[in-house]
């Protein structure tokens, strides 16, 4: 793979208990960080097509992963990225002999079927863990279960997953623990039959989304989660749902769909956070779900700054993202690093190793 994605620089620090002295700072790295196997597989597949260099255009259906450094790299090599909000435009712009690349998150089933019916050169980089979610949802949809999916409603993985349930079962998306608790309250209500109406009324307030409420099955439920959610919260959501549903004598089938790589990164990040560093940098794309959850985890321990890449840091200011406000702001480097001696760096599974190394080099120079 391209040197952008290599781990060589960071391996210098790995035999030193994940701590390196960088200038005036002690930099703490987790046991596990950087690209997961699914991301590496997706990037290799796309790189292999580029290396063929046979003159055919390459169209990527949305970002390959949610990291701007990675996507910009592929754009520089001539890959055409179709905007996630307008994937159907592929049919207007791509010739039939073009390479059409399905990203790691997957795409909605109807769109995939149309693309496979029109194009011959399709490169599917969908993560195998995501496909496991699809298999579970497809099976439970055939059983007419009410599908509960714990995840970010607008995320492409979630949209691809719920499309596997087709239109013959009710699908409910819960974005967070508060939504799960509220939904549990509705399930506990004696007026359960009115849930299909209630859920639509509160969606805008609680962030809950409901599809096909006319097929709501109050006796059989199936629970899955987006593969990059916080593992600890996923367990809590299952506990909340199971307690309520089984108390009523109904059925809940649950599938642990948080991928192992995500779980390991969260576990390693938690171990670093418990050391209570003076400061924590979270590094990754602003749209990255697994990076966002590392941010949420780290907030409980130390001051946290969410950085897109190494360009976010210079001698005068640090650009960082506030997820709660969906806003990038600037802070004085001098003020942020005042009285700081230890800095933990946590990176999402879609963050290149070289970006982490560049941040360490930036800190050395400050």
Language-model features: where?
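The feature marks the mature, well-folded catalytic cores of soluble enzymes
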Residues: 1-366
């Amino acid at each position: 793979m391209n040197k952008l994605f290599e781990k060589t620089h960071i391996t210098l620090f790995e035999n030193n208990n994940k701590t390196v002295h960088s200038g005036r700072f002690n930099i703490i790295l987790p046991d596990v960080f950087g690209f997961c196997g699914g991301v590496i597989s997706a990037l290799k597949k796309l790189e292999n097509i580029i290396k063929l260099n046979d003159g055919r255009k390459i169209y990527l259906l949305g970002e390959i992963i949610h990291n701007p450094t990675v996507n910009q790299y592929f754009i520089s090599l001539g890959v055409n990225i179709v905007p996630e909000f307008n994937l159907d435009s592929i049919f207007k712009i791509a010739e039939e002999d073009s390479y059409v690349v399905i990203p790691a998150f997957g795409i909605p089933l109807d769109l995939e079927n149309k693309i496979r019916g029109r194009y011959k050169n399709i490169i599917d980089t969908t993560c195998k863990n995501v496909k496991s979610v699809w298999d579970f949802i497809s099976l439970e949809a055939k059983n007419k279960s009410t599908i509960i999916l714990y995840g970010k409603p607008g995320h492409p993985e979630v949209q691809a997953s719920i499309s596997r349930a087709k239109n013959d079962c009710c699908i409910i998306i819960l974005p967070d623990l508060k939504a799960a608790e509220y939904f549990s309250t509705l399930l506990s209500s004696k007026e359960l039959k009115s849930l299909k109406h209630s859920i639509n009324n509160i969606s805008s307030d609680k962030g809950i989304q409901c599809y096909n409420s006319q097929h709501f099955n109050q006796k059989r439920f199936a629970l899955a989660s987006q593969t990059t959610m916080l593992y600890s919260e996923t367990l809590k959501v299952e506990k909340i749902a199971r307690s309520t549903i089984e108390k009523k004598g109904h059925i809940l089938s649950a599938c642990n769909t948080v991928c192992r790589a995500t779980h390991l990164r969260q576990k390693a990040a938690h171990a670093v956070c418990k050391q209570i560093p003076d400061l924590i940098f979270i590094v990754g794309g602003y749209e990255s779900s697994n990076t966002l959850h590392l941010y949420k985890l780290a907030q409980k321990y130390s001051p946290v700054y969410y950085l897109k890449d190494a360009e976010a840091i210079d001698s005068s200011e640090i650009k960082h993202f506030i997820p709660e406000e969906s806003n990038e702001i600037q802070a004085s480097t001098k003020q942020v690093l005042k009285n700081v001696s230890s800095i933990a760096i946590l990176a999402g599974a879609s963050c290149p190793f070289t970006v982490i190394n560049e941040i360490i080099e930036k800190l050395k120079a400050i």
